[in-house]
Amino acid sequence: MAVTGVLRNGRYYAGKTAIGLQGMLTGTGMCLGTEILERHGWTAFSVGEDWEFSVELLLGGQKIYFNPLAKTFAKESQNFKQASHQRLRWASGRYAVMGSKVSALIRQGILTSSISLIDSAVTLFAPNYSSQASLALLCLVGSWVNVGDPFWGFTFYWAAALIAAIASYFVLGIFSTEAPGKALVGLVLVPVFLPWRLTIELLGMLGYGRRHWGRRSRSATSSKHVNR
Protein backbone atom coordinates (compact mmCIF):
# COMPACT_ATOMS: atom_id res chain seq x y z
CA MET A 1 0.00 0.00 0.00
CA ALA A 2 2.89 2.34 0.79
CA VAL A 3 4.47 1.52 -2.57
CA THR A 4 1.34 2.27 -4.60
CA GLY A 5 0.88 5.48 -2.60
CA VAL A 6 4.38 6.63 -3.51
CA LEU A 7 3.84 5.72 -7.16
CA ARG A 8 0.51 7.52 -7.31
CA ASN A 9 1.59 10.69 -5.54
CA GLY A 10 5.35 10.87 -5.92
CA ARG A 11 5.48 9.71 -9.53
CA TYR A 12 2.11 9.91 -11.30
CA TYR A 13 0.63 13.14 -9.94
CA ALA A 14 4.02 14.80 -9.58
CA GLY A 15 4.78 13.88 -13.19
CA LYS A 16 1.45 15.29 -14.38
CA THR A 17 2.18 18.53 -12.55
CA ALA A 18 5.63 18.76 -14.13
CA ILE A 19 4.16 18.71 -17.65
CA GLY A 20 1.28 21.06 -16.87
CA LEU A 21 -1.57 18.60 -16.40
CA GLN A 22 -3.98 18.74 -13.49
CA GLY A 23 -4.22 16.63 -10.38
CA MET A 24 -7.22 15.38 -8.45
CA LEU A 25 -8.38 16.07 -4.91
CA THR A 26 -7.17 13.23 -2.72
CA GLY A 27 -9.18 12.85 0.46
CA THR A 28 -7.07 13.72 3.49
CA GLY A 29 -4.76 15.89 1.42
CA MET A 30 -7.33 18.30 -0.01
CA CYS A 31 -6.75 22.03 0.43
CA LEU A 32 -9.40 24.46 -0.84
CA GLY A 33 -9.39 28.24 -0.90
CA THR A 34 -12.35 30.05 0.65
CA GLU A 35 -13.05 31.74 -2.69
CA ILE A 36 -13.58 28.30 -4.26
CA LEU A 37 -16.15 27.34 -1.64
CA GLU A 38 -17.84 30.73 -1.91
CA ARG A 39 -18.09 30.38 -5.68
CA HIS A 40 -19.00 26.70 -5.98
CA GLY A 41 -20.19 25.67 -2.53
CA TRP A 42 -19.74 22.04 -1.54
CA THR A 43 -21.71 19.82 -3.90
CA ALA A 44 -20.11 16.40 -3.32
CA PHE A 45 -21.94 14.11 -0.90
CA SER A 46 -21.18 10.64 -2.25
CA VAL A 47 -18.70 8.16 -0.73
CA GLY A 48 -16.26 9.31 -3.43
CA GLU A 49 -16.53 12.97 -2.53
CA ASP A 50 -12.96 13.82 -3.53
CA TRP A 51 -13.39 12.40 -7.05
CA GLU A 52 -16.85 13.93 -7.34
CA PHE A 53 -15.80 17.43 -6.32
CA SER A 54 -12.68 17.20 -8.48
CA VAL A 55 -14.83 16.69 -11.56
CA GLU A 56 -17.21 19.49 -10.57
CA LEU A 57 -14.29 21.90 -10.23
CA LEU A 58 -12.68 20.82 -13.49
CA LEU A 59 -15.93 21.16 -15.41
CA GLY A 60 -16.36 24.58 -13.79
CA GLY A 61 -13.04 25.75 -15.20
CA GLN A 62 -11.01 25.53 -11.99
CA LYS A 63 -7.45 24.27 -11.83
CA ILE A 64 -6.40 21.51 -9.42
CA TYR A 65 -2.74 21.58 -8.51
CA PHE A 66 -0.68 18.84 -6.89
CA ASN A 67 1.96 19.97 -4.40
CA PRO A 68 4.76 17.35 -4.34
CA LEU A 69 6.24 18.90 -1.18
CA ALA A 70 3.06 18.54 0.87
CA LYS A 71 2.69 15.78 3.47
CA THR A 72 -0.48 14.47 5.03
CA PHE A 73 -0.67 12.33 8.15
CA ALA A 74 -3.31 9.70 8.84
CA LYS A 75 -3.67 6.37 10.57
CA GLU A 76 -3.45 3.67 7.93
CA SER A 77 -5.50 0.47 8.06
CA GLN A 78 -3.85 -2.16 10.24
CA ASN A 79 -5.22 -5.33 8.64
CA PHE A 80 -7.12 -6.64 5.63
CA LYS A 81 -10.49 -6.36 7.40
CA GLN A 82 -10.07 -2.63 8.06
CA ALA A 83 -8.55 -2.03 4.65
CA SER A 84 -11.34 -3.93 2.87
CA HIS A 85 -14.03 -1.53 4.09
CA GLN A 86 -11.91 1.50 3.24
CA ARG A 87 -10.80 0.32 -0.21
CA LEU A 88 -14.32 -0.82 -1.09
CA ARG A 89 -15.63 2.65 -0.29
CA TRP A 90 -12.90 4.24 -2.39
CA ALA A 91 -13.46 1.88 -5.32
CA SER A 92 -17.24 2.14 -5.23
CA GLY A 93 -17.12 5.93 -5.04
CA ARG A 94 -14.71 6.19 -7.95
CA TYR A 95 -16.81 3.91 -10.16
CA ALA A 96 -19.95 5.89 -9.33
CA VAL A 97 -18.28 9.15 -10.37
CA MET A 98 -16.73 7.47 -13.39
CA GLY A 99 -20.09 6.25 -14.63
CA SER A 100 -21.71 9.66 -14.39
CA LYS A 101 -18.89 12.11 -15.13
CA VAL A 102 -16.27 10.65 -17.49
CA SER A 103 -18.34 11.37 -20.59
CA ALA A 104 -18.82 14.99 -19.48
CA LEU A 105 -15.06 15.45 -19.05
CA ILE A 106 -14.33 13.97 -22.47
CA ARG A 107 -17.09 15.96 -24.16
CA GLN A 108 -15.99 19.28 -22.63
CA GLY A 109 -12.36 18.43 -23.31
CA ILE A 110 -13.13 17.92 -27.01
CA LEU A 111 -15.33 21.01 -27.28
CA THR A 112 -12.71 23.22 -25.61
CA SER A 113 -9.67 21.43 -27.08
CA SER A 114 -8.47 20.76 -23.53
CA ILE A 115 -6.00 17.90 -23.30
CA SER A 116 -6.01 18.37 -19.53
CA LEU A 117 -9.73 17.54 -19.22
CA ILE A 118 -9.36 14.44 -21.37
CA ASP A 119 -6.35 13.41 -19.28
CA SER A 120 -8.46 13.86 -16.13
CA ALA A 121 -11.06 11.53 -17.64
CA VAL A 122 -8.33 8.95 -18.24
CA THR A 123 -7.14 9.37 -14.63
CA LEU A 124 -10.66 8.64 -13.41
CA PHE A 125 -11.17 5.72 -15.80
CA ALA A 126 -7.80 3.95 -15.57
CA PRO A 127 -7.53 0.89 -13.27
CA ASN A 128 -5.32 1.18 -10.20
CA TYR A 129 -1.84 -0.36 -10.20
CA SER A 130 -2.80 -3.65 -8.55
CA SER A 131 -5.69 -4.16 -10.97
CA GLN A 132 -3.37 -3.44 -13.89
CA ALA A 133 -0.98 -6.10 -12.58
CA SER A 134 -3.79 -8.64 -12.09
CA LEU A 135 -5.21 -8.02 -15.56
CA ALA A 136 -1.74 -8.31 -17.11
CA LEU A 137 -1.23 -11.67 -15.37
CA LEU A 138 -4.60 -12.88 -16.63
CA CYS A 139 -3.61 -11.79 -20.14
CA LEU A 140 -0.34 -13.70 -19.84
CA VAL A 141 -2.11 -16.89 -18.74
CA GLY A 142 -4.83 -16.51 -21.36
CA SER A 143 -2.36 -15.85 -24.17
CA TRP A 144 -0.28 -18.92 -23.31
CA VAL A 145 -2.44 -20.95 -25.71
CA ASN A 146 -1.34 -18.67 -28.54
CA VAL A 147 2.38 -19.36 -28.19
CA GLY A 148 3.62 -20.59 -31.55
CA ASP A 149 0.56 -19.37 -33.42
CA PRO A 150 1.77 -17.45 -36.51
CA PHE A 151 -0.89 -14.78 -36.14
CA TRP A 152 -1.74 -14.52 -32.42
CA GLY A 153 1.58 -15.64 -30.94
CA PHE A 154 2.61 -12.03 -30.33
CA THR A 155 -0.05 -11.67 -27.61
CA PHE A 156 1.94 -13.79 -25.14
CA TYR A 157 5.10 -11.75 -25.61
CA TRP A 158 3.11 -8.52 -25.45
CA ALA A 159 1.60 -9.63 -22.11
CA ALA A 160 5.04 -10.67 -20.81
CA ALA A 161 6.50 -7.29 -21.77
CA LEU A 162 3.58 -5.54 -20.06
CA ILE A 163 4.16 -7.48 -16.83
CA ALA A 164 7.88 -6.67 -16.98
CA ALA A 165 7.08 -2.96 -17.35
CA ILE A 166 4.62 -3.01 -14.43
CA ALA A 167 7.09 -4.95 -12.26
CA SER A 168 9.88 -2.47 -13.06
CA TYR A 169 7.64 0.44 -12.14
CA PHE A 170 6.71 -1.31 -8.90
CA VAL A 171 10.38 -1.85 -8.04
CA LEU A 172 10.92 1.88 -8.61
CA GLY A 173 8.14 2.50 -6.08
CA ILE A 174 9.74 0.14 -3.56
CA PHE A 175 13.04 2.02 -3.60
CA SER A 176 11.21 5.35 -3.44
CA THR A 177 9.61 4.53 -0.08
CA GLU A 178 11.15 5.54 3.23
CA ALA A 179 11.69 1.87 4.17
CA PRO A 180 12.62 -0.12 1.03
CA GLY A 181 13.62 -3.17 3.09
CA LYS A 182 10.22 -3.39 4.73
CA ALA A 183 8.53 -2.93 1.35
CA LEU A 184 10.62 -5.75 -0.13
CA VAL A 185 9.57 -8.08 2.69
CA GLY A 186 5.97 -7.19 1.89
CA LEU A 187 6.35 -8.78 -1.55
CA VAL A 188 5.52 -12.15 0.01
CA LEU A 189 1.94 -10.89 0.36
CA VAL A 190 1.56 -10.11 -3.36
CA PRO A 191 -0.16 -13.48 -4.15
CA VAL A 192 -2.76 -12.59 -1.50
CA PHE A 193 -2.90 -8.86 -2.14
CA LEU A 194 -3.62 -8.95 -5.88
CA PRO A 195 -6.71 -11.24 -5.76
CA TRP A 196 -7.98 -9.36 -2.69
CA ARG A 197 -7.59 -5.99 -4.38
CA LEU A 198 -9.14 -7.18 -7.65
CA THR A 199 -12.14 -8.52 -5.70
CA ILE A 200 -12.53 -5.12 -4.03
CA GLU A 201 -12.51 -3.45 -7.45
CA LEU A 202 -15.12 -5.83 -8.85
CA LEU A 203 -17.40 -5.33 -5.84
CA GLY A 204 -16.95 -1.57 -6.12
CA MET A 205 -17.84 -1.73 -9.81
CA LEU A 206 -21.06 -3.55 -8.87
CA GLY A 207 -21.95 -0.80 -6.39
CA TYR A 208 -21.18 -2.46 -3.05
CA GLY A 209 -20.07 -0.02 -0.35
CA ARG A 210 -21.71 2.93 -2.05
CA ARG A 211 -24.49 3.65 0.45
CA HIS A 212 -22.58 4.55 3.63
CA TRP A 213 -19.34 6.46 4.20
CA GLY A 214 -18.54 4.64 7.47
CA ARG A 215 -15.03 5.33 8.77
CA ARG A 216 -13.51 2.29 10.51
CA SER A 217 -11.50 2.42 13.74
CA ARG A 218 -7.71 2.16 13.67
CA SER A 219 -5.97 0.10 16.34
CA ALA A 220 -2.58 1.78 16.02
CA THR A 221 -1.79 4.73 18.25
CA SER A 222 0.74 6.36 15.98
CA SER A 223 0.04 8.33 12.83
CA LYS A 224 1.90 7.71 9.62
CA HIS A 225 1.90 9.91 6.57
CA VAL A 226 0.51 7.86 3.72
CA ASN A 227 0.41 10.53 1.04
CA ARG A 228 3.28 12.66 -0.14
Q: Which sequence ranges carry the predicted segments?
A:
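Alpha-helical membrane-protein architecture signal
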Residues: F80, S84, S114-A121, V188
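Short linear elements at protein peripheries
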Residues: R210-R228
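Long helical/loop segments within the catalytic core of UDP-sugar-dependent glycosyltransferases
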Residues: M1-A44, L88, Y95, G99
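Loop-to-transmembrane boundary segments
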Residues: I110-S130
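Catalytic core of nucleotide-sugar-dependent glycosyltransferases
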Residues: V3-G10, S84-L105, S134, W196-G204
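Membrane-embedded multi-pass helical conduit in multi-pass membrane proteins
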Residues: T123-Y208
